[in-house]
């Protein structure tokens, strides 16, 4: 099992436009009416009053402005998994990074994902993954079974460089490429995920239900989040280290990778969110603990 705190995102460049089409850029010298929508920096706001001359506050709802979220270019770096950055054919981003070894993409709609690491403008590492996959167990399934595209892809064991540049390319030629979240950082080994007791992965549906007068049920605002429970074996000498780490990052969402081998296709045990419970019976040499992770919406 690996845990990866999210590094600060510093975007150098991207093919995704900085400004969203059809949304006015905020002008501090202009007066806005109720319902006017503007964008400023990487945020979108809606005016909540007439004769509005107040300035919107970055990433916050105020008495004058309702914060609607990030612009398209920055949605894949916000605090939600339910929003996505989309662009025709491909998404290309370049980031300033330091000493990272793990990169993970969530909510992908893509055929391929490519990463490149540059040090002093020289390409020092690259890798590419196809997202298309098919599960077949017999000849009949081979001929008729539809394929699918992976929505989660992660890269491990990336060589670390300080002052490097990371370039990612998310490609879906002829369609809209999309990604809901991108995380990169330095991983910490949390031990060996056990197959027995079995790990669990569940999806929780946060749906609002309202019963109408005619008896029909109206559902709105359906959002889901993932919950993962893992049983992990760890050297007892590292228990204090793990507990201290979790205490330090108790209020910070992190990337949790339950099974490191990408070839095993166990992305259902990969989540980005917060640990909820950490139970650690301590043994003499080895300790087995259980950790419960709740993904963000």
Question: For the regions a protein language model found, what residue spans apply to each?
Answer:
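Extracellular/virion structural assembly segments
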Residues: 1-10, 14-15, 70-85, 101-110, ...
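Tryptophan-rich substrate-binding surfaces of secreted polymer-degrading and adhesive proteins
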Residues: 1-82
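Short beta->alpha connector loops
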Residues: 29-30, 97, 109
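Short, well-ordered loop/turn elements at secondary-structure boundaries
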Residues: 33, 40, 97-100, 162
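Generic structural detector for well-ordered beta-strands
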Residues: 46, 92-94, 231
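Short beta-strands within extracellular/lumenal beta-sheet-rich domains
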Residues: 83-97
């Amino acid at each position: 099992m690996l845990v990866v705190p999210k590094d600060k995102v510093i975007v150098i460049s991207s093919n995704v436009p900085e400004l969203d089409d059809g949304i006015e850029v905020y002008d501090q010298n202009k007066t806005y009416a109720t319902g006017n929508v503007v964008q400023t920096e990487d945020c979108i706001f809606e005016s909540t009053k007439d004769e509005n001359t107040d300035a919107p506050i970055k990433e916050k709802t105020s008495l004058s402005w309702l914060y609607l979220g990030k612009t398209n270019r920055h949605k894949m770096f916000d605090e939600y998994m339910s929003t996505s950055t989309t662009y025709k054919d491909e998404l290309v981003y370049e980031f300033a990074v330091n000493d990272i070894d793990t990169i993970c993409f969530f909510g992908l709609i893509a055929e391929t994902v490519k990463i490149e690491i540059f040090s002093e403008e020289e390409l020092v590492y690259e890798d590419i993954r196809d997202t298309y996959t098919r599960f077949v167990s017999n000849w009949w399934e081979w001929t008729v079974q539809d394929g699918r595209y992976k929505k989660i892809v992660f890269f491990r064991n990336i060589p670390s460089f300080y002052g490097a540049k990371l370039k990612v390319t998310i490609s879906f030629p002829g369609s809209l490429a999309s990604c809901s979240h991108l995380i990169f950082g330095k991983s910490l080994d949390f031990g060996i995920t056990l197959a027995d007791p079995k790990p669990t992965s569940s999806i929780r549906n946060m749906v609002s239900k309202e019963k109408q007068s005619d008896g029909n049920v109206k559902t709105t605002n359906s959002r889901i989040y993932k919950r993962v429970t893992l049983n992990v074996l760890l050297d007892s000498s590292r228990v204090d280290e793990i507990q201290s780490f979790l205490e330090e990052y108790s209020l910070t969402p992190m990337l949790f990778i339950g099974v490191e081998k990408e070839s095993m296709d166990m992305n259902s045990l990969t989540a980005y969110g917060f640990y909820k419970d950490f139970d650690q019976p301590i043994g003499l040499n080895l300790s087995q603990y259980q950790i419960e992770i709740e993904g963000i919406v």
